[in-house]
């Protein structure tokens, strides 16, 4: 049994006093009772659905609030954090000690004199590199969310649990002094890396707790040579590990969920001396337009103990997954064991030998697959390119490019080159190969079929792509296979998908120019300058 007096003393040390009751690491059964009990109002209220899962609403914040993210500027962080600047804008905005203290007072005052849920868990399935996290909240479903998403400790581990990091969620409190303090709004998500505390105020979005700890892992791990990656990962029958990087909508979750392979995790991983390990104990999947036919694993994971966010629940308790009226970013969190085909008992495996960068190129320029050199690996990892098709007022669909460093710029706490260095070092030590896979469009105007993309992934994973005869794509100087089993050969060279190759040429020159322009921000040191040669020639 955990000593609750010890927990209360630790809360007092944080500035949380006169707690009415501590509900410590509640069971799923208890959480279900707490979040559906009569009398709950507003965003605290959970609704039971016919799936067996409880649904909650997060209010106006149906996604993360990057404009309200701050890190305390101090001796520890001033030369390590990748601070936002005019030349390279990002979400790491500095906060002074006085402002931090006033926010901490607001949150601790909000949590004092209340009945609190305290959930202890781990971030990271590696004993050496995990962080012991304590989450303190007055809201039952927020405790449920973190129980789903972090790694659940054993009774034995809880006996001597010492938190390395504390998340204090004060979603009910806002900051009245934000204007004088020069902040973005009355809401805040603030981190103090010296005190090892995250404060949340004003936003009820569950993902702030998950991605907050990801940002923390992204700070501490690379500084000791351990990879911290925004990727999914799976392992084959022979123990061969693949990792899939990609921004939202590129196929990261879909392509790593493979009946022939066991899932390590779907979103956040580390790479240490033993191999690849999941940071999380659960999954946080998008549910918009979810169907059993298209994504059976996720669909079946939505049952008792899963927690739905911002979905529309009909009068009879059924869920309308096609209704995006609250947000397109409808979500579900569930413990990872709700998926059958997973690595057990610990979400970790050996070193990755295949590293796949997924991009959905709406310009129709990039090949469906290319093999990268070590220099190209760093270049395309730092570029983190994808593109969406957005309709314009005249009905023309224009591609909008996104360049997100390391396929996860929103969560990087250190300079992107540090993640690239660790990744390539780990890859070289493991003899891993890297591939750029375009799940987007080509000259036909259609999206590359999921059948062809799965065929490409199979060829990478079974090694047959290594035996393929290779050609080279000009401008980008990418190595592309001439034929792959189970893949339509007519699409492998994107130039062949255009009625007129000159069309590809002009689009390729346009896209190459965008890559070059984006990469300027990395050419501020010698290493960055050296990588320019690995990129496209504008």
UniProtKB/Swiss-Prot annotation:
- Alphabetized SUPFAM superfamilies for the sequence: PEP carboxykinase N-terminal domain (SSF68923), PEP carboxykinase-like (SSF53795)
Concerning Pfam families, the annotation shows:
PEPCK_ATP
Origin organism is Haemophilus influenzae (strain PittEE)
Q: Where does ATP bind?
A: 211, 230, 246-254, 295, 331, 447-448, 453
Task: Indicate the principal place this protein occupies in or around the cell.
Answer: cytoplasm
Q: Binding of substrate: at which residues?
A: 64, 205, 211, 331
Q: Does the keyword Membrane apply?
A: no
The EC code for this enzyme is 4.1.1.49
> How does the annotation summarize its subunit structure?
Monomer.
Names of required cofactors? Mn(2+)
> What's an example GO BP annotation here?
gluconeogenesis
Task: State the protein's name.
Answer: Phosphoenolpyruvate carboxykinase (ATP)
State the UniProt keywords alphabetically: ATP-binding, Cytoplasm, Decarboxylase, Gluconeogenesis, Lyase, Manganese, Metal-binding, Nucleotide-binding
The record ties this protein, via InterPro entries, to: PEP_carboxykinase_ATP, PEP_carboxykinase_C, PEP_carboxykinase_N, PEPCK_ATP_CS
Q: Which GO terms describe its molecular function?
A: ATP binding; metal ion binding; phosphoenolpyruvate carboxykinase (ATP) activity
Q: Name the pathway.
A: Carbohydrate biosynthesis; gluconeogenesis
CC terms in the record's Gene Ontology section: cytosol
């Amino acid at each position: 049994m955990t000593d609750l007096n010890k927990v209360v003393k630790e809360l007092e040390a944080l500035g949380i006093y006169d707690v009415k009751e501590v509900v410590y690491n509640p069971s799923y059964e208890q959480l279900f009772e707490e979040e559906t009990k009569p009398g709950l109002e507003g965003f605290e209220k959970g609704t039971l659905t016919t799936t067996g899962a409880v649904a909650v609403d997060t209010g106006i914040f149906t996604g993360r609030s990057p404009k309200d993210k701050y890190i305390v500027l101090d001796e520890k962080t001033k030369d390590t954090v990748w601070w936002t600047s005019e030349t390279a804008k990002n979400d790491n905005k500095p906060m002074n000690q006085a402002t931090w203290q006033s926010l901490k007072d607001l949150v601790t005052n909000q949590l004092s004199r209340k009945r609190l849920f305290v959930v202890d868990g781990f971030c990271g399935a590696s004993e050496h590199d995990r962080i012991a996290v304590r989450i303190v909240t007055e809201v039952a479903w927020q405790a449920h969310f973190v129980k789903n998403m972090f790694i659940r400790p054993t009774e034995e581990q809880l006996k001597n649990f010492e938190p390395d990091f504390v998340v204090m969620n004060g979603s009910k409190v806002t900051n009245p002094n934000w204007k004088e303090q020069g902040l973005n709004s009355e809401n805040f998500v603030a981190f103090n890396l010296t005190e090892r505390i995250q404060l949340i105020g004003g936003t009820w979005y569950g993902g702030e707790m998950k991605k907050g700890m990801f940002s923390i892992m992204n700070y501490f791990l690379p500084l000791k040579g351990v990879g911290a990656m925004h990727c999914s990962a799976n392992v084959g029958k022979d123990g061969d590990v693949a990792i899939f990087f990609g921004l939202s909508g590129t196929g990261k979750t879909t392509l790593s969920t493979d009946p022939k392979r066991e899932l390590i995790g779907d979103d956040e991983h580390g790479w240490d001396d033993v191999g690849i390990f999941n940071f999380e104990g659960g999954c946080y999947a998008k549910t918009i337009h979810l169907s059993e036919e298209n994504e059976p694993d996720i669909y079946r994971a939505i049952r008792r103990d899963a927690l739905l966010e911002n979905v529309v629940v009909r009068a009879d308790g059924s869920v309308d997954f096609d209704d995006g009226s609250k947000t397109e970013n409808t979500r579900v969190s569930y413990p990872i064991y709700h998926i059958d085909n997973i690595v057990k008992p610990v979400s970790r495996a050996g070193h990755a030998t295949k590293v796949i960068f997924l991009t959905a190129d709406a310009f129709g320029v990039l090949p469906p697959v290319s093999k990268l050199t070590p220099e190209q690996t760093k270049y395309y990892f730092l570029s983190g390119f994808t593109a969406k098709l957005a309709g314009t007022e005249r009905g023309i669909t224009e591609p909008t490019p996104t360049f997100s460093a390391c396929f996860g710029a929103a969560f990087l706490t250190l300079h992107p080159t540090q993640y690239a260095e660790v990744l390539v070092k780990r890859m070289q030590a493991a003899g891993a190969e890297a591939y750029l896979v375009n799940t987007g469009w080509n000259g036909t105007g259609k999206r590359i079929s999921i059948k062809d993309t799965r065929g490409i992934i199979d060829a990478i994973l079974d090694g047959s792509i290594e035996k393929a005869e290779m050609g080279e794509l000009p401008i980008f100087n990418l190595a592309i296979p001439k034929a792959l089993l189970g893949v339509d050969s007519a699409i492998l060279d994107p130039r062949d998908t255009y009625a007129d190759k000159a069309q590809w040429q002009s689009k390729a020159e346009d896209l190459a120019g965008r890559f070059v322009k984006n990469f300027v921000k990395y050419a501020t040191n010698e290493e960055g300058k050296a990588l320019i040669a690995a990129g496209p020639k504008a």
